[in-house]
Amino acid sequence: EMPLIEGLIAIGPQLQKEYPGKKLLLIANMDSNVRDIMRREEELRKYYAFAFPSLKIIEDTSDKAKFPLLAAEHGLNVPQTLEIDFSGSLEDELAKLEQVNQPFPWIIKPATSAGYERLKWPGKAKVYTVSNKEEAQTLLANLYQHTHNNPHARRFVLQPRVEGNDSFNLSVTAYVDQNLRVTMLGSAQVLLEDHSPTALGNPVAMITEPYPRLYEQVSSFLKGVGWHGFANFDFKVDSRTGIAYCFEVNPRIGRNSYYNTSAGMNPMRFFVEDVVEGKAIAPQRLGKRVYYSILPKRLVLRYVDKQMGKKIKTLYRLKKNHDPLFYPADFGFSLRGLKRFAYVMIARENHWRKYHRNYPVAKFRQGETRSLDTAALTQP
C-alpha cells in the first residue's frame, strides 16, 4: 500500500486547477518515498515535476551487495565487501570467510532491509560486529537459522570496520541535471553525530569545505550510472590509513543539506533551474568554510580535539556559524514568536541531557579522541 502516492495522485487535478500554468514540484527526503514515487512515475508525472534516478538505479545502489560492484565499476572507493547468500548451504558461505584478508573487527549487515526488518528474535540487530573468525562463524550460523523461511532476508554483506570517531565522517551533496551534468557539489566534515536511538548517525555539527578528489569520484560514479536529481554520499576516512571510503549514496537530498545553503550554495536553485526552467546552469562547487550545528558550542567542544576546537572558535569569531533552527524572522515580538524562541533554546539545552545519557564524554574518551585533519582532502 502507498497511501502517500495515492493521495498525491488524487489531489493532483485539484492542485493544477488552483495553480494554473505552474509546475508542481515534488521532492522527497526519505528513500522509501523516492522508491514509491518512481514505482508510480508515469501517473505522477501527469501532475508533478520531479527529478530522481530510475527505479533500477535506486534498487541497485541501495543493495549493499550490488552497490560495491557498481561503485568499483565507476571509480568510487568502497570497503572490501564479501556477499553472504544463504540461498545455498551454510557450509559454502562459511568457507567464504577464508577469502577475507582484512584485519578484525568485521562488520556484518543485511544486504537489503526488505524482509529482514520484519523478523524478530533475541539478539537481532541492524549491524553486527565480530572480533574473530569463530564469532563470525557463530553469527552466520545464527543468521542462517533465523532467516531460513524468509527468502528476501537471506543475503548479507561482510566488510572490515573502518575506524575513526564521528569527525572521520564526510558528507557530499550533489545534483545531476537532465543532461547528465553534475551541476552542484557541496561537502562537509562531520564533527559530531546524533547518538540518540531514534536519530542515530544524523550529523548535528559540521564544517563545510571542498573535497576535490572526492568530487572526482562522485562525478564519475553519477555520470557512469546515469543519475538524475540529488544524491547524498556518506564517506568515512579510516583513521589507520587515511583512505576515504564511500558507504552509501541516497537518491535524495539529505536531512542536513542546509549546510550547503549556509555556505552560500542553495541546492534548490539547481533543482529549479533544471526541472522548472530547463536551463543548463553553470556547475558550481562549494568553496566557503562555515560551522553548521544545532548544538551548543560548548557541548561540541567536548567531543573534538584542541585543533578542531580552535577552528570552531575562529569561525564563530568571524561570524561564520549557522544554526538552521535559529532564524530571527521566526522570533518576532508576538506570542508565537516568543514560543518559537523558547522552544529552540530549550531544545538546544536539552542536548546536554541527551548526550550525557547516550554518548557521555567518558565513552568518547575510551576511543580515539583525535579529530580528523582534512588538509590533504581539500587539496586538488
Regions picked out by a protein language model, each given a short descriptive name:
Residues 197-200, 208-233:
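Oxyanion-binding "anion nests"
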Residues 60-156, 179, 213-215, 380:
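Active-site nucleotide/adenylate-binding loops and adjacent lid/helix of ATP-dependent enzymes
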Residues 131-195, 209-216, 237, 244-245:
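Phosphate-binding site of ATP-dependent enzymes
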Residues 192-203, 250-264:
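Glycine-rich phosphate/pyrophosphate-binding beta-alpha loops
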